């Protein structure tokens, strides 16, 4: 009964899941947060029960010790069934890492070197890896990169039309993100369609507070909406998605906004929040239903951008077998699904209202029976995908 511990570490917190790989079931999960603050906290779930504790957590090493204490006190026992691998989510692997990689000192050095591309994410992942290696010194650790799935993009998809020497010197290209989710969902879609993965043409819409689209041909990503950073592409909760870059020059010249201010504007004060003052899709929909014109416009912009990418990716794929919705908004918001695909019937893409309104946590069809293009809702499971990749990377 091999078990894998999956860790998603940030600068001041980390989440974990212990997954039994024969049945792919979650044995335990938890959260350690407020690391480095006067009062930290842990939350541990196992066997249908949950326990919380407040305590000082000086650093990630202390956080992992608190996690080990929770396992020892509440189970399951890691001494009786130690993990065969520890899988770590790492946001940015650049063009260095194209697959899950067993962690070595050289790998950690490369991840650190890539922190310039992900300053908010990679350093926290490294802290988590170091602490986890202290906690589990005899277990292989595997780094699974959000960007790796998109390393199959062709040059015409990942290249920006700027000075090529400048781009090369600063590693400027499209990397894409949410790759672990896009991989998990596209493979699940092939199984649901009953087709070999190599024969599928799938558009995945990962719609959460962060959002991205991907065109997946034969199980390989050939295009994706996020770029050098997770800022490009679809409209998101607080991020702008695609804009004319000259907007930044205009604002720099005509306001007192500096470089950091502009970065904050696009990442944290734009998207649905910037358009409406509301960052949650459900709140925006309620406001729109109550007649708020700004909210109605925001929903229109959100849907317009999704349709833009669906059409573009259908062209890149040369046809579509399935459009798949996943992540928090994509899985749980029937109105977003219906309105985002409205008007695409000429492409064979449509929604069955009864299927679409069904509340379910299962993977399912929401398109009409016999539709030329399947529309699917598939709950993503990035932790399980990390566990699968970690186990595969350490096998043999």
From Swiss-Prot:
Belongs to the acetokinase family. The gene is ackA. The lineage of its organism: Bacteria, Bacillati, Actinomycetota, Actinomycetes, Micrococcales. It is found in: Cytoplasm. Its main location: cytoplasm. It catalyses: acetate + ATP = acetyl phosphate + ADP. Signal peptide: none annotated. This is Acetate kinase. The record marks 178, 239 as: Transition state stabilizer. Its EC number is 2.7.2.1.
């Amino acid at each position: 009964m091999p078990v894998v511990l999956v860790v998603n570490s940030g600068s001041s917190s980390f989440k974990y899941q212990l997954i039994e790989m024969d049945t792919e079931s979650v044995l335990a999960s938890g959260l350690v947060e407020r690391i480095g603050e006067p009062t930290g906290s842990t939350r541990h779930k196992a066997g249908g029960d949950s326990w919380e504790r407040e305590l000082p957590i000086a650093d990630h090493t202390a956080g992992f010790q608190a996690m080990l204490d929770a396992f020892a006190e509440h189970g399951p026992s890691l001494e009786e069934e130690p993990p065969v691998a520890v899988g770590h989510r790492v946001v940015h692997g650049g063009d260095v890492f194209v697959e899950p990689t067993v962690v070595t000192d050289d790998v950690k050095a490369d991840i650190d070197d890539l922190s310039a591309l992900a300053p908010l994410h990679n350093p926290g992942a490294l802290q988590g890896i170091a602490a986890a290696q202290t906690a589990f010194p005899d277990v292989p650790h595997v780094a699974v990169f959000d960007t790796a799935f998109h390393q199959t993009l062709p040059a015409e998809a990942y290249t920006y039309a700027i000075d090529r020497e400048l781009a090369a010197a600063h590693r400027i290209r499209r990397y894409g993100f949410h790759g672990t989710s896009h991989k998990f969902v596209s493979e699940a879609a092939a199984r649901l369609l009953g087709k070999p993965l190599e024969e599928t043409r799938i558009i995945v819409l990962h719609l959460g507070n962060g959002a991205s689209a991907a065109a997946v041909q034969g199980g390989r990503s050939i295009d994706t909406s996020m770029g050098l950073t997770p800022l490009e592409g679809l409209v998101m909760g607080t991020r702008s998605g695609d804009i004319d870059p000259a907007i930044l020059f205009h604002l720099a010249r005509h306001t007192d906004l500096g470089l950091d201010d502009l970065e904050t504007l696009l990442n944290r004060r734009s998207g649905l929040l910037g358009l409406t003052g509301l960052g949650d899709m459900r709140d925006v929909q309620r406001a729109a239903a109550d007649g708020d014109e700004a909210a109605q416009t925001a929903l229109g912009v959100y849907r317009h951008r999704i349709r833009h990418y669906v059409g573009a990716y259908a062209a890149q794929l040369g046809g579509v077998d399935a459009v798949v919705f996943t992540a928090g908004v994509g899985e749980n918001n029937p109105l977003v699904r219906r309105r985002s695909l409205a008007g695409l019937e000429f492409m064979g893409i449509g929604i069955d209202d009864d299927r679409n309104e069904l509340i379910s946590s299962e993977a399912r069809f929401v398109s009409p029976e016999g539709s030329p293009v399947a529309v699917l809702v598939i709950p993503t499971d990035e932790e399980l995908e990390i566990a699968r990749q970690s186990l595969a990377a350490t096998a043999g």
